[in-house]
Amino acid sequence: MIFGSRRRIRGRRGRSGPMTRGLSALSRAVAVAWRRSLQLRVVALTLGLSLAVILALGFVLTSQVTNRVLDIKVRAAIDQIERARTTVSGIVNGEETRSLDSSLQLARNTLTSKTDPASGAGLAGAFDAVLMVPGDGPRAASTAGPVDQVPNALRGFVKAGQAAYQYATVQTEGFSGPALIIGTPTLSRVANLELYLIFPLASEQATITLVRGTMATGGLVLLVLLAGIALLVSRQVVVPVRSASRIAERFAEGHLSERMPVRGEDDMARLAVSFNDMAESLSRQIAQLEEFGNLQRRFTSDVSHELRTPLTTVRMAADLIYDHSADLDPTLRRSTELMVSELDRFETLLNDLLEISRHDAGVAELSVEAVDLRTTVNNALGNVGHLAEEAGIELLVDLPAEQVIAEVDARRVERILRNLIANAIDHAEHKPVRIRMAADEDTVAVTVRDYGVGLRPGEEKLVFSRFWRSDPSRVRRSGGTGLGLAISVEDARLHQGRLEAWGEPGEGACFRLTLPLVRGHKVTTSPLPMKPIPQPVLQPVAQPNPQPMPPEYKERQRPREHAEWSG
């Protein structure tokens, strides 16, 4: 029995589960609609307040009507029982030859016959009469009519010589339901004769029910009308607000010619005028900023192109002098080396400015091919590895054992990695720099982690700004121009990828490049975490398959590097 009871309990829980979930979902949907819809809140509050007022008024009016109907009934019943008492006294005091029971029955029949509408009697309506003489000692009580329907409390008042009335539910041969029972003692030769009249309240109850139904129907119709009125009134406010919201969204999307329609001279019209004035002012400012931006980009592009021709001439002359520097005295030889070095930096700056101008103008294009990104990482390490060797910084490389094929512009991705590794070397403080790669089904990520000075709060975004430097006094070992990370983040966006930064003061920094494996796909997640998991960082064996930079990287270095990377 216990087990059966448990099974039944589990069954009830199982059946109530979907209903509970459905109610929960419905409540959440209603809550969302309540928060998001001003019109719904206005209509609901209007209906709620109107319902409260209608209920209060309905209760008051129903009470007033009920009391009025019953008061009329009571007054008519009092008049009726006064006449009935006179009639009973005349019959009982008439012939002495009749027995008491016969006299009581005759009086009852006479009273009930007067309720016939054709006789013009019965002002309070139809009624039934009860006559009773209580028993005294051995003498039994004499009654006429349904004496058992008279409440004992009412009989107590009448025995005390008082006229009284009471509402009660009765069941007689001709009527069953609520009734008004009124009683009074009579003045006759028969001592303690009591007279009671039972007035059914069927007609009064029907009248009150009709009034209540009419008021309920009227209240329901009034609620519907109020809901429609509230809906129309709130619509006059909500529609312009929604229109302003839609126009503001389109304005934010770049449709600067969008304006709100102005109708009339009310508050909404003034709101539309103010909104249009604001939109016009913003449009002018945006147009001015676009014009200034175009002028700036055109100036940068023109200056870069104009400087390239004389720079090429100077470069040829400098290379010629540098090739014969062995024939010069030491002072001139040193000057020649400095000139060539600064020309390298100047040429890199011009290349970066041209690249930035192409990104700003929106003409930068990808030369996509399917490549193994491990090779791209190795090429980047080969170009900047000598910087780590000169600074005494160990490069720890962790690459997958399998190929990582991605559809990318290998030149741009390699430039991103060169910039990230060179930037890490500049800020590593003679501590190792770790390069990791991982891939999943859709994306590939490369992180470059250093354990140097790190980044202060808020610098994760500033680090990608043009010419921004966290510490202007720090010397760049890589000789960068300050545009490398700005170009890198644009190259990442061109691939529909992400370039992100994290850092803490004294803990170092981590830059993460995430790219889609297939061109056109968007990056939603990254296979590598941004914030590194705490672990020993000074030991190369702390990561699986860590390895220093291979020796062949050193053989690939040239005396003078003309790569496109910058710090």
Curated annotation (Swiss-Prot):
Q: Which residues form a coiled coil?
A: none
Histidine kinase domain segment(s): 302-519
PTM section of the record? Autophosphorylated.
Q: How does it sit in the membrane?
A: Multi-pass membrane protein
**According to the UniProt entry, which residue ranges have a biased composition of type Pro residues?**
529-551
Q: Which residues carry this modification: Phosphohistidine?
A: 305
Query: Where is the signal peptide, in residue numbers?
Result: none
Which EC number(s) does UniProt give? 2.7.13.3
What GO cellular component entries does it have? plasma membrane
The portions of this protein that span the membrane are 42-62, 213-233
Could you confirm whether the keyword Nucleotide-binding appears in this record? yes
Localization annotation: Cell membrane
Ranges for domain HAMP come to 235-287
The record's comment on cofactor binding reads: Autophosphorylates in the presence of Mg(2+) and/or Ca(2+), but only Mg(2+) ions promote phosphotransfer to MtrA.
Q: Does the keyword Nucleus apply?
A: no
Question: What are the required cofactors?
Answer: Mg(2+); Ca(2+)
Extract the PANTHER family matched here: HYBRID SIGNAL TRANSDUCTION HISTIDINE KINASE C, TWO-COMPONENT HISTIDINE KINASE
Task: Note the subunit structure.
Answer: Interacts with MrtA.
**Physiological role:** Member of the two-component regulatory system MtrA/MtrB. Probably functions as a membrane-associated protein kinase that phosphorylates MtrA in response to environmental signals. Probably plays a role in cell division.
Name of the featured protein:
Sensor histidine kinase MtrB
Record organism: Mycobacterium tuberculosis (strain CDC 1551 / Oshkosh)
User: Which gene name does the record give?
Assistant: mtrB
